[in-house]
Amino acid sequence: MTKILVLYYSMYGHIEALASAVAEGAKKVADVEVTIKRVPETIPPEAFTKAGGKVDQSAPVASVQELVDYDAIIIGTPTRFGNMAGQMRNFLDQTGGLWAEGKLYGKVASVFTSTGVGGGQEMTITSTWTTLAHHGFIIVPIGYGIPEIGDISQMQGGTPYGASTIADGDGSRIPNENELKIARYQGEHVAKIAKKLKD
């Protein structure tokens, strides 16, 4: 059984929605077990609520040590100034012990994100790849494997690096169907590769 972790941070629910779609896609692949977890919140609860953060996220919180249990990890993070969110950064910064022992070496990884218009979706994904490369992950982009990536009939996310969604300033725009299709494709694509490598 190939084990896949969809690991995310979501403040307003955009990444949470993409994470569900990624997991849905991965579950299409036979003999694959998919788990969705989120990283711990670092913003004090009162401040998080005041900022409009989505408090009713059902995914359990992940621990750093459990990362070794998975064959593939698909990371979802919103953009913060062209980088991953601080909550994801804080979580990954705690993987030094795993790095020192090579515990994540050779595992599969992929990244998806949410940004504002011109917010750096590609930069966020590729800057997250840097951390993954230091661990020796096999990084899986999605290329142009799904036609929705090239759809210019509407404003949308989606890059050859990974799925994404465009979030407006007040968080009211939710992922559209094309963005969710791309996320499902990413999950399925990564699951197929992880399974092949494990077999």
UniProtKB/Swiss-Prot annotation:
NCBIfam families: flav_wrbA, PRK03767.1. Its EC number is 1.6.5.2. Substrate binds at residue 99. Its cofactor is FMN. Belongs to the WrbA family. Binds 1 FMN per monomer. It comes from Photorhabdus laumondii subsp. laumondii (strain DSM 15139 / CIP 105565 / TT01). One of its GO terms (molecular function) is NADH:ubiquinone reductase (non-electrogenic) activity. NAD(+) binds at residue 12. This is NAD(P)H dehydrogenase (quinone). It catalyses: a quinone + NADH + H(+) = a quinol + NAD(+); a quinone + NADPH + H(+) = a quinol + NADP(+). GO terms for cellular component: membrane. SUPFAM superfamilies: Flavoproteins. FMN binds at residues 10-15, 79-81, 134. Residues 4-190 form the Flavodoxin-like domain. Keywords: Flavoprotein, FMN, NAD, NADP, Nucleotide-binding, Oxidoreductase. The keyword NADP applies. Disulfide bonds: none annotated. Pfam families: FMN_red.
